[in-house]
Regions:
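Transport-system extracytoplasmic interface segments
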Residues: 1-56
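Membrane-interfacial helix-loop-helix junctions in multi-pass membrane proteins
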Residues: 33-37, 116, 168-222
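Residue-level hotspots within the lipid-embedded alpha helices of multi-pass solute transporters
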Residues: 34, 47, 51, 59, ...
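A hydrophobic alpha-helix feature that marks transmembrane segments and, especially
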Residues: 50-72, 91, 140, 144
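Hydrophobic transmembrane alpha-helices
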Residues: 50-54, 95, 128-133, 158-167, ...
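Hydrophobic alpha-helical segments typical of transmembrane helices
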Residues: 60, 71-72, 95, 103, ...
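Short helix-to-coil transition segments within interhelical loops
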Residues: 66, 75-83, 145
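Alpha-helical transmembrane segments and their short interhelical loops
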Residues: 83-157, 161, 206-213, 217-218
Length: 223
């Protein structure tokens, strides 16, 4: 929107300087991926990533710490179940909740907010699954380092604040100072928002979005 306004002002200046002359070239600005300049077309796809991270991260953040407070974590550790099996058992219900949430939010975006989906639904589903696993890992890490549920909630809120402000959801990252920009690159939701807007608005394919996949895989592997 700001670029369109600046472009319009530039054309007005040109017309003022050449009032009585015929311009050999007529400038007509054209918006490619959001021609109606609807705010919902830009904000709602990014909102999918924010909502998905909020729900999955907060639910998972309480998964292990609740067992610590109830004193049942030690009992689970001495069972024949492996640590991998225990982790999968803890995360599986939240993964199903996250998948259901993605379906519901996409349906609301399409039919309630009337945002068209230009790209591949299958590609969107694949990236959503990758981001879902990364977000679950982030919530599990918060749950592991927290001593109680209050502390887990505080850390989760501490993670969510930069996720909303620095991920490009509200403000373009290109206009941020470099240190703030670097912090934004460490957030998994940054890459997922780029994927969402790329697929939904620009019909972007995997060839264009593979750097975002690498970013999610690296962060997910670290978590």
């Amino acid at each position: 929107v700001s670029n369109a306004i600046a472009l319009r002002k530039s054309f007005a200046v040109i017309r003022q300087r050449l009032p009585g002359q015929t311009q050999p070239v007529e400038f007509q600005p054209r918006v490619l991926f959001n021609p109606d300049m609807k705010t919902a077309n830009f904000m709602v796809p990014g909102l999918i990533g924010i909502v998905l991270q909020v729900v999955t991260m907060f639910l998972t953040a309480f998964a292990v710490v609740r067992e610590k407070e109830n004193g049942t974590l030690e009992q689970l550790m001495v069972t024949p179940v492996s640590r991998l099996g225990l982790m999968v058992g803890k995360l599986a219900p939240y993964a199903f909740i996250g998948a259901f949430e993605v379906c519901m939010v996409v349906l609301l975006m399409r039919f309630l907010f009337q945002v068209p989906i230009a790209g591949s639904i299958l590609l969107l589903a694949g990236f959503s699954l990758l981001f879902l696993l990364t977000s679950l890992g982030l919530g599990l890490m918060i749950s592991t380092i927290s001593a109680n549920q209050v502390q887990a909630m505080q850390i989760a809120f501490l993670v969510m604040l930069p996720s909303v402000l620095l991920s490009g959801f509200m403000f373009p990252q290109e206009s941020m100072p470099f240190p703030i920009y670097v912090i934004g690159q460490a957030l998994p939701v940054t890459y997922f928002i780029r994927v969402l807007r790329g697929i939904i608005l620009r019909d972007a394919g995997f060839i264009e979005l593979w750097p975002q996949a690498i970013g999610l895989i690296v962060i997910g592997g670290f978590l």
